[in-house]
Swiss-Prot record:
GO terms for molecular function: metal ion binding; phospho-N-acetylmuramoyl-pentapeptide-transferase activity; UDP-N-acetylmuramoyl-L-alanyl-D-glutamyl-meso-2,6-diaminopimelyl-D-alanyl-D-alanine:undecaprenyl-phosphate transferase activity. It is found in: Cell membrane. It comes from Nocardia farcinica (strain IFM 10152). Disulfide bonds: none annotated. Catalyzes the initial step of the lipid cycle reactions in the biosynthesis of the cell wall peptidoglycan: transfers peptidoglycan precursor phospho-MurNAc-pentapeptide from UDP-MurNAc-pentapeptide onto the lipid carrier undecaprenyl phosphate, yielding undecaprenyl-pyrophosphoryl-MurNAc-pentapeptide, known as lipid I. The keyword Amino-acid biosynthesis does not apply. One of its GO terms (cellular component) is plasma membrane. This is Phospho-N-acetylmuramoyl-pentapeptide-transferase. The chain crosses the membrane at residues 3-23, 54-74, 84-104, 114-134, 156-176, 187-207, 231-251, 255-275, 283-303, 330-350. Its main location: membrane.
Length: 358
């Protein structure tokens, strides 16, 4: 428990102090956000706001995680684990893809960076490498960071995948979550605030899995998850890093996370869902991100079939803006939706445990 608090404290401190330094540096370098020309007119005033703030989130997460382990040496805590390093590595790899995308946008002075094919190639490469490595590193309890079963709150043993199908599934999960968070990052503080609520829920889930781990408590309802406590450190560091960044990203934003941050955070969710054996539960807890992505898919599908638009603009947070909701109203209400989804998901998680223990 102490390490979780240390991870959060360090990540929060690094993120909240590093972000203003990045604001000054990026502003000096002219690294400003380009705004989509077909977006809400009110967003044009945001043109030139420093972007790529996701760098602060990533550095904050790594600092919190590694710093908590350095402190843990004092009381003989276990060192970094394969599961946590793989999840952080996936987030960092996708953050690198986002950084390249952001940099191209800035250099070309337009809201178009990497081509769709180039972005998907980067996402798929990161996903496949993660998937391959996640089936390695068998721990003392015989568990690998990932399993080839589909999972809800724990593995669904009746649904097993071969290696190729598993890698395809991991690729789908990674691409879907990274793009979902990317689409949500369209209003000041929306993605960072929503992400802190989702990751906060996962701090509880991973700590519960640690407390009821089959490796230490082989009892009814225990969890077969490799390194749950270390994954809790990642979740705590991620939550705190997002909150620290949100201090400067809240409306009116002084900096945007850019694709650097949104792709990284989406990768973090994907990696956590796989390593904690909660792939289907993550859809519930991260329902806001799912809804944002679904709104884009529905908008395209309806337009192609009927030539009419389902929403005034997609992702659907823009629909509410164009319906005369103030930007801050949309943001706060969406945060509330994210909080409700996280709470509902935690309720499902706990109810499954109660059912398992009889």
């Amino acid at each position: 428990m102490r390490q979780i608090l240390f991870a959060a404290a360090i990540a929060l401190t690094v993120s909240i102090l590093l972000t203003p330094a990045l604001i000054k540096f990026f502003a000096k370098q002219g690294f400003g956000q380009e705004i989509r020309v077909d977006g809400p007119a009110s967003h044009q005033s945001k043109r030139g706001t420093p972007t790529m703030g996701g760098v602060a989130i990533l550095i904050g997460m790594w600092a919190g995680y590694l710093g908590s382990h350095l402190i843990g040496i004092a009381y003989d805590a276990e060192g970094p684990s394969a599961s946590a390093l793989l999840v952080l590595g996936l987030a960092t790899a996708l953050g690198a893809v986002g950084f390249i995308d952001d940099f191209i946008k800035i250099r070309k002075g337009r809201n178009l960076g990497l081509t769709a094919a180039g972005k998907y190639l980067g996402q798929l490469t990161a996903a496949i490498v993660f998937g391959v490595l996640a089936l390695q590193f068998r721990g003392e309890n015989g568990l690998t960071p990932a399993s080839r079963h589909l999972s809800y709150v724990r593995d669904i043993t009746t649904v097993s995948m071969g290696v190729i199908v598993f890698l395809a599934f991991v690729s789908l999960v990674v691409v879907a979550w990274s793009n979902a968070v990317n689409l949500t990052d369209g209003l000041d503080g929306l993605a960072a605030g929503s992400m802190s609520l989702v990751l906060g829920g996962y701090v509880i889930i991973t700590f519960w899995q640690y407390y009821h781990a089959c490796a230490t408590k082989p009892e009814t309802g225990c969890y077969n998850v490799r390194d749950p406590l270390d994954l809790a450190l990642v979740c705590a560091a991620g939550t705190a890093a997002c909150i620290g960044f949100l201090w400067w990203n809240a409306a009116p934003a002084k900096i945007f996370m850019g694709d650097t941050g949104s792709l990284a955070l989406g990768g973090l969710l994907a990696g956590l869902s796989i390593t904690t054996r909660t792939e289907l539960l993550m859809v519930v807890i991260g329902a806001l991100f799912v809804a944002e992505a679904a709104s884009v898919v529905l908008q395209v599908a309806v337009f192609r079939t009927t030539r009419n638009r389902l929403f005034k603009m997609a992702p659907f947070h823009h629909h509410f803006e164009l319906s005369k909701w103030a930007e801050t109203t949309v943001i706060i209400r969406f945060w509330l939706l994210a909080a409700m989804a996280s709470a509902f998901g935690l309720g499902l998680f706990y109810s499954e445990y109660l059912s398992a223990v009889g």
